[in-house]
């Protein structure tokens, strides 16, 4: 804990509000709310914490707080601050998933569409549906039952839907506004839960057609009834009151929280939503934040009623969302809550099993690697590899592994600038110098371990630059390969010595993954550069083809092979004069 934080902790008030944790770059990394700011914020810097909370605390270099007049005001402010800053440790709804809706468009001749975007365009929206397949199946059923227009744009003649009796063909025939209004009202009634009434009406029409010996017509009605049953009645009836409601329950353990949401539509459980995230404070407070974000971020429509557990502040949710909130004590609604809680508990159990397996491959591996190398646990590993063919187009690449996993946003590619010919040692010196000069200049995080895909010479070159030029003390190890180009040994120390690792150990497998990844990244970059060089060379010396036109041709065709397949006319279409295009075609065919 630094001096600035100590001084600020002493000034925290006994009032509700929000706090913003910041890292060394002054970036907001976590936002929280508290009933009493002094108690909540101080708790982060006292006592023991689990590993993930300790990781958060270790990154905090400063914090700010905003006092509010009430808990509900703090909750609303917290939601807005999370939206504004998108902190990396507020991960509960990062996917920002949107659900599909069925829309009746507001047009002269309306149509049905499935969409994830709800706009203020006077169209009628129904949903949300649990997935796009459910929405499409329902739309397909409605298309069979109600002959609204199907085409995005009205064609010049009738289409197949007209001949199937599924469209009135407003493209050719006059369809009145009254007819369209009646159809949209019928669809609206159906989507609002009136499909049982529609089914009864179809059954009556089927019976009437059968009595009148109109057997083909009766068969059509029978098929429509079957479509309704197969599409709308797959789910078991959960509640008989036909009220749309969302059921929330949660479970927490070992610093993680799982929230399960059951979507009840027209009395049926149609789908669920599962969210799992790290827990940094009391579960009931985290749940309040979750439920506020759930309806503000995920494009969810508020149902008529929400069911929540007894442990939750019901009044605060009602004030926040302006919706009817229930905490049932018995009966079918209570059973739904218990079922959601059971699912949340099972999901956490499954999560922990997967975490344990994953941690053995990642966190467990880096901890064992640190012990084997006699260094601190290398949470951040940066690995380097060179690539060239007899000194042409020399490049280097760096990959980053955080907590034993690749962090591709931080991968870097380097064109070698100061070295000529096949000089791996000189190339490594240049790249290490460029990388860590920038790290020092921009105050970026230093790695806990640097891995060099190479032997003693390259490791020594890297160490010389780090220690003697930049004054850095970072462990450097070399990844040595055997005759079959497989990870064989690890070099570290001064003087460099081989560290033996069990070949079937997780730390050895981790090194293999890192070595394979940095090699893949370097090779792919080198091939990319060679492809560009080959492309440039075949165009050299052609009159009228300068750097700009080379870039244009490369961007359009992508490779020499594809450009050789092009005609002068194809090249001319790029805005290149025909005469120049013909010269290019001739040069490529030589």
Curated annotation (Swiss-Prot):
The keyword Transmembrane helix does not apply. InterPro entries: GIY-YIG_endonuc, GIY-YIG_endonuc_sf, GIY-YIG_UvrC_Cho, RuvA_2-like, UVR_dom, UVR_dom_sf, UvrABC_protein_C, UvrC. This is UvrABC system protein C. It is found in: Cytoplasm. The UvrABC repair system catalyzes the recognition and processing of DNA lesions. UvrC both incises the 5' and 3' sides of the lesion. The N-terminal half is responsible for the 3' incision and the C-terminal half is responsible for the 5' incision. Signal peptide: none annotated. GO terms for molecular function: DNA binding; excinuclease ABC activity. NCBIfam families: PRK00558.1-5, uvrC. PROSITE patterns: GIY_YIG, UVR, UVRC. Belongs to the UvrC family. It comes from the Bacteria. It holds the Pfam family UvrC_RNaseH. One of its GO terms (cellular component) is excinuclease repair complex. Coiled coil: none annotated.
């Amino acid at each position: 804990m630094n001096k600035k934080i100590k001084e600020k902790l002493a000034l925290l008030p006994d009032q509700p509000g929000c706090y913003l944790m910041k890292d060394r770059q002054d970036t907001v990394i976590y936002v929280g709310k508290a009933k009493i700011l002094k108690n909540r914020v101080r708790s982060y810097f006292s006592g023991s914490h689990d590993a993930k909370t300790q990781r958060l605390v270790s990154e905090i270099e400063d914090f700010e707080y905003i006092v509010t007049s009430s808990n509900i005001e703090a909750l609303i402010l917290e939601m807005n601050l999370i939206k504004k800053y998108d902190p990396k440790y507020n991960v509960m709804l990062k996917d920002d998933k949107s659900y599909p809706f069925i829309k009746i468009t507001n047009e002269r001749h309306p149509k049905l569409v499935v969409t994830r975007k709800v706009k203020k365009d006077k169209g009628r929206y129904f949903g949300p549906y649990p997935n796009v397949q459910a929405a499409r199946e329902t739309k397909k059923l409605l298309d069979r039952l109600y002959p609204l227009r199907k085409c995005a744009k009205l064609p010049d003649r009738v289409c197949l839907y007209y001949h199937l009796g599924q469209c009135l063909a407003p493209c050719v025939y006059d369809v009145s506004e009254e007819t369209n209004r009646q159809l949209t009202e019928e669809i609206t009634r159906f989507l609002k839960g009136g499909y049982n009434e529609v089914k009864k009406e179809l059954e009556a029409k089927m019976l009437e057609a059968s009595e009148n010996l109109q057997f083909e017509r009766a068969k059509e009605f029978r098929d429509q009834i079957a479509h309704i049953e197969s599409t709308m009645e797959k789910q078991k009836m959960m509640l008989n009151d036909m009220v749309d409601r969302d059921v929330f329950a949660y479970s927490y353990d070992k610093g993680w929280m799982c929230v399960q949401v059951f979507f009840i539509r027209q009395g049926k459980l149609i789908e669920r939503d599962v969210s799992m995230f790290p827990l940094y404070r009391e579960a009931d407070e985290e749940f309040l934040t979750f439920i506020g974000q759930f309806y503000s971020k995920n494009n969810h429509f508020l149902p008529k009623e929400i069911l929540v557990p007894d442990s939750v502040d019901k009044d605060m949710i009602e004030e926040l969302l302006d919706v009817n909130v229930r905490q049932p004590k018995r009966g079918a609604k209570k059973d739904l809550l218990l079922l959601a809680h059971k699912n949340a508990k099972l999901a956490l159990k499954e999560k922990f099993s997967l975490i344990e397996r994953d941690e053995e491959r990642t966190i467990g591996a880096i901890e064992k690697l640190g012990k084997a190398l006699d260094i601190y646990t290398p949470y951040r590993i940066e690995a380097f590899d060179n690539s060239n063919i007899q000194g042409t187009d020399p490049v280097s690449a760096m990959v980053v592994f955080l907590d034993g996993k690749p962090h591709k946003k931080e991968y870097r590619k380097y064109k070698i600038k100061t070295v000529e010919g096949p000089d791996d040692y000189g190339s490594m010196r240049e790249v290490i110098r460029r990388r860590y000069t920038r790290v020092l200049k921009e105050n970026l995080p230093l790695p806990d371990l640097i891995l060099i895909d190479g032997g003693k010479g390259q490791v020594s070159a890297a160490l010389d630059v780090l220690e003697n030029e930049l004054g850095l003390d970072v462990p450097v190890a070399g990844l040595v390969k055997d005759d079959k180009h497989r990870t064989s040994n690890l070099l570290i120390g001064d003087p460099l010595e081989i560290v033996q690792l069990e070949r079937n150990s997780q730390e050895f497998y981790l090194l293999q993954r890192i070595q394979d990844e940095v090699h893949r990244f370097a090779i792919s970059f080198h091939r990319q550069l060679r492809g560009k060089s080959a492309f440039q060379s075949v165009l050299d010396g052609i009159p009228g083809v300068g750097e700009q036109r080379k870039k244009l041709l490369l961007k359009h065709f992508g490779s020499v092979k594809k450009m050789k397949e092009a005609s002068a006319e194809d090249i001319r279409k790029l805005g290149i004069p025909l005469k120049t295009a013909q010269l290019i075609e001739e040069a490529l065919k030589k």
